[in-house]
Amino acid sequence: MRAALIVLWMLLCSVSSAVAQVSIGINLSLYPELVPVPGYPVYYAPRMEANYFFYDGLYWVYQGDTWYSSSWYNGPWWIARPEVVPVFVLRIPVGYYRRPPVYFRGWRSDAPPRWGEHWGRDWERRRTGWDKWNRSSVPKPAPLPVYQRQYSGDRYPRLEQQHPLHSQQYRYQPRDTVVRQHYREQAARSARTPAQRGDQGALQQGSDRQPHQEPPRGQGQGQEKGRGRDEERGRERNR
């Protein structure tokens, strides 16, 4: 019991340091169709070409060997390190990943991915018991935040608008201790100004907003040359 409490404490302490806001290339114009995974408190998106799930009040995406979470269907997305991914997300059977990575090949479709084999012994030691549970006492799936269907396209809220809307229209409180920590961290960050977050407003939604865009090739050089000619003419007039 004591060992389990120590592991849980380590997980909670690492959640905040694991969270970072990123753009993952998912750009949904409408609320996705979400279907329950039989026997699990999880939903998946059968029509999406993405490993897109919903569990305990948050959306979860597995992409590029990384887990991401968000309280809104189109992000922004926050990194969840392997050490702080909820166990029922880790337990989702391989067959419900719509874009399974290459290393899933050969694994049973009705069983969870072999995360210990993939992430190594150190991870497996920290997350011991993740793949063992009483299937007769699985919690019920959380209700979907279907109010978000009315927020699509240009109506999709900015980060600072999301938490107030969510808290007003979605009364469900996460049961999972780790999810509650993720949820609190995301809510706290959304309450900050862009300057306080340090995100420069560039990573709000999907792939249409890039963290950095370089000017067209030659444009910066042309501007520098133009400024140089203007300065030279000014010096000639002052002589």
Can you name each region flagged by the protein language model?
Residues 227-238:
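Short, low-complexity, Pro/Ser/Thr/Gly-rich segments in the mature regions of secreted, periplasmic
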Residues 219-225:
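Ser/Thr/Pro-rich, intrinsically disordered low-complexity segments
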Residues 3-14:
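Bacterial N-terminal signal peptides
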Residues 21-189:
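Low-complexity segments
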Residues 2-3, 76:
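Short helix C-cap/helix-to-loop transition motifs enriched in small/turn-promoting residues
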Residues 168, 187-188, 192-203, 207-215, ...:
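Eukaryotic N-terminal intrinsically disordered, low-complexity segments enriched in Ser/Pro
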Residues 15-20:
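Sec/Tat signal peptide C-region and signal peptidase I cleavage site
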